[in-house]
Amino acid sequence: MALHIGTSGWSYPTWKPGFYPDKLPAKRFLEYYSTQLNSVELNLTFRRFANASSQQNWIAATTPGFKFAAKIHQMITHFRRLKDCETPLRNFLQSLDLLREAGKLGPILIQTPPNLKADLALIADFVGLLPTAYQFAFEFRHDSWFTDAVFDVLKKKNAALCWAESEKMEAPHVSTADFLYYRFRQPEYSKAQLKKLTEEFMAQKEVFAFFKHEDTPEGAQNAVTIARAAGIEAKPFEMPAKKGKK
């Protein structure tokens, strides 16, 4: 079982002191994060490509085996709405080459707009463009997509149906790939719910799971609870030395 667990993003000062140490400078957030959790979901790639300098810094800051999932650019999902995407898809994937070459690129999350309804020909054509060397997960935000015909298209490409849940919608738990991709958006999760999720994850071959809470540290804390219960231990981290001390 391979569990890659974390949150959507990490650059949140409001996570102090519940997750980040109070005196930790923001430039070391990712370094500390990677000692507690082993994966993160990049949301910034939805609006802009990750440049080489950023990727080099992320690679250097994270522990061995750490994985970055990346949300695909809005040009593909929201502007072109999955149509005529061969060139922008190729450009997006190439923009992540440094992470991939370092062995730190996780799945690409393809999050469709809420007003994009199911179109079997559209999804079949788009999925046909996806190179098999990558992992892809689809988060559909209109329930018309949740049909066997769509699931079959994903299965043929080993693309995962994202099991996303929020107060507005919950995707059906249908497995379409050899890995699972979860996104948790509920405001609260009880200890019993986290225990159940841990058991569910442990029964799978490979899982990517991300909690979302930008304003408070609960999402990161929930991810840590599951990580520790699943046997993912915290790694050593050295806090910055106080000024005037060596």
Positions of PLM-derived features:
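Residues lining hydrophobic/aromatic ligand-binding pockets adjacent to catalytic sites
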Residues: 1-246
